[in-house]
Amino acid sequence: MARRDRVIITIGGTGVGPRNRTPEATEPHIDTLLPGLMTQILFSGLSNTAQAGLSRGLVGLSSRDSTAALIVNAPSSSGGVRDALGVVCPLFGSIFERL
C-alpha cells in the first residue's frame, strides 16, 4: 500500500479450509471494518448458493482519511468475485467522497 492504492481486492483464501488465511493476513491493514458491505456481499452470494455462507471475507478501510484504501476479500469462485464486485464497485465514489 506504499503507492497509495485506493482499492485492494484479494481473490481467494476466504473459506474454512486450513490454508484459507486471507482475512487473517489483511485484517492488520484494516483500520475500520465495513460490516454492512460484508453483509451485502453475503446476501448477494446467498441468493445464488448456500456455500456463500462459508466465506469469511472482510471489507474495510485502511484509514479514515484521504489516504485510505478500500480492502475487499472476495472468494475464489467467479460467482463470489462477481458478488463482491457487484456490491462494492457502485459504492467507490460514495466511499471516497466521505474521506
What are these regions (language model features)?
Residues 1-99:
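Non-catalytic beta/alpha edge segments that cap or flank active sites
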